């Protein structure tokens, strides 16, 4: 491959990290950004991660909301290939079986640290969006025969739709781990903290961000970790 292709929301952290990785490896990078949030000012598409995408040398294109962005990425990859490039497509959030293996490793590291330090927890709580984090954690814990529940606080989709998406990726991930006894009821999703939609913080999100900043010196974001912390609280 000589070109990385990926997609995400306008201010996608994953897209920015992909652009940086491409720069390090001497690869070209083509990013598709979805306008998920209505009524944003023009600066929203020129600043922050979009600016950093371009600083890293990525080609950036925008798409309107409510289209299949992974299908769009595949189509762009095909077009680049027809023009002589050798593209490698990475789904949004890096959420495929290969990407989920990163959070399989995370699950293993967590359990190792729990054992070494004799720590016990009732559950893991995190923000669930493009599904890679939750699928990787659930698959990794299953590989370790751990019964520790993983609760995903949805930042975008309703519960059943998110469970379907996570379960699809779990099945693809455990296949790589040669596991075949995982059950769908391991996928736990709470959709009570989405509010008005993706990247639109609720009052609870803002309160959680304020609380952590003032009591722990930890900065959360209004898209993912702020909603997850609101769910934990």
Label every PLM stretch briefly.
Residues 1-233:
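PLP-dependent amino-acid enzyme catalytic core
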